[in-house]
C-alpha cells in the first residue's frame, strides 16, 4: 500500500491551484423562435449589434438586422433548412467582412468571397469590412482623368472619368451588359482592375460574360462576383458591397478600379423581400423607407482619391432596368439622383438597328469634358449639337413634304454621323480611331458617299492610317492634343483614301 506524505498532498493541491485558469468566456446566446423564408426570429441575444454575424447550431451564418424589444430579426446567408425551432444561436461579435487580396484577380466568387469557379481556394492577404464608410470630402479630388470605354458615342459625348459614377439605364434586352463588358475589354493594358458584380442574373448569362472576358484575355485584371437568381435574397443584397470592398482594397493601394453593378434593380428587389419578411413598414412601390440609403452608401464609395492618398480611383457603372422606358419609377429616380450622369439605352433605337442604342438626347455626364483628353474635346465639341439638331429636323421632316437644300444637306450629314456611332459588340476603338471617325464625319468628308458605304470607308481609312501614317497615332497618344501636324496627316489620308475608294466603287 502506497503511503502519501502530508506535505506531498499540500504540494499537489498548490500545483493544481496555480494551474487553475480563472478566464470566463461569456457567450451571448439566444433561441430560435421561428424560422422560414430566409428569416429567423431569435429570443435572447441581448447585446447583439446591428449588422452583427450570428451562428446557428448547425453552422448557418446570419446577419442581425432587426433589433426589437422582444426578439431579433436575422436574415440567413443560406437556405437554413436544418435550423430547428428551439435550437440555440450565438453572437460572433463580428460585423460581416470578407478576405481580400491580389489572388482574387481572374476568379469568380460569391458574395462571401468564396470561389465558385472550381479552381481551388484563394489565398487572401487581409480582410475588409463589407460595409465601409465612403471617403470624406478632404480624401477626394475632382475627376480629371478619362476612363475610355472604347464606345465612340460615350467617349465623345457622355465621357466617363476615373472616380465617376455613371448610371447605365434602359429596358431589358437593350444592351446594358454589353456596354459594361465592352468597357472592361477596353481597359486591357490601361492598368485598371475591373470588378463585375452580377446580382440576380441567370447563371447562363453570367457564364456568357465570363467566357467573353476569358476569350479576350480580360479575366487577368477582372474579378467576377456572382449571386444568381436562385441565391438567397440576403446574398443578392450583399453582393454589391462585397464587390465594392474588393475594389476599395485596390483603390487604397493607389490603383485604378472599375466596378460594374449588374443590376441594382435586382438588389433593391432582394432588399424589399428581406424587409417585408422582417415586417418593416413598406413605402412607395412596397420598398422600405431606407432603399435610397441602400444605394447611396454603396455608390458614394466610388471616388477619386486625393494626392495625399495616392490618387487611386474607383469608377462605378451601376446598371438599372426600367419597365417600358419609365425613368420616373422609384429606383431609377433614386439612382439617377445619386450618380454623376446616366447613359440611357432605348428599346426603339435598339430595334431600329442602332447599336449601342444610346439615346444621346437624354444621356448626360455631369463631369463633362473634364473627363476627356484635349484632342477629343477639339474634335467632338460640335458632335452632340449636330446630332440634336438632326433629331429635331428629322422629326419635322416627317411632316414637311419639301425641304430646302440646306435642310436636306443637314439631314444627310446627320444620317451619316448616326451611322458612324454604330459599333459591333466586343469591338472597342482606341482614342485615335475615334478621333479619325468623328473628324471625318463632322467635317463633311462623308457627304458625297452613299449611306451604305460609310462604314466600309471608315474601316478602310483607319487601316490605311495605321499602316501608312503611324505618326498620327503617335501624336495623339503622346501629346493628347489634335495638333496641326495630326490634322494635316489626317486630311491627307482622307483625300488619298477617298480617291482610292471611289476608284474601287467604279470598277
Curated annotation (Swiss-Prot):
Pfam families per record: ATP-synt_ab (PF00006), ATP-synt_ab_C (PF00306), ATP-synt_ab_N (PF02874)
Keywords attached to this entry: ATP synthesis, ATP-binding, CF(1), Chloroplast, Hydrogen ion transport, Ion transport, Membrane, Nucleotide-binding, Plastid, Thylakoid, Translocase, Transport
Main location: plastid
InterPro entries xrefs: ATP_synth_asu-like_sf (IPR023366), ATP_synth_asu_C (IPR000793), ATP_synth_asu_C_sf (IPR038376), ATP_synth_F1_a_nt-bd_dom (IPR033732), ATP_synth_F1_asu (IPR005294), ATPase_a/bsu_AS (IPR020003), ATPase_F1/V1/A1_a/bsu_N (IPR004100), ATPase_F1/V1/A1_a/bsu_N_sf (IPR036121)
Site location (Required for activity): 363
Recorded GO CC terms: chloroplast thylakoid membrane; proton-transporting ATP synthase complex
Matching HAMAP family: ATP_synth_alpha_bact
Family: Belongs to the ATPase alpha/beta chains family.
Annotated protein name in UniProt: ATP synthase subunit alpha, chloroplastic
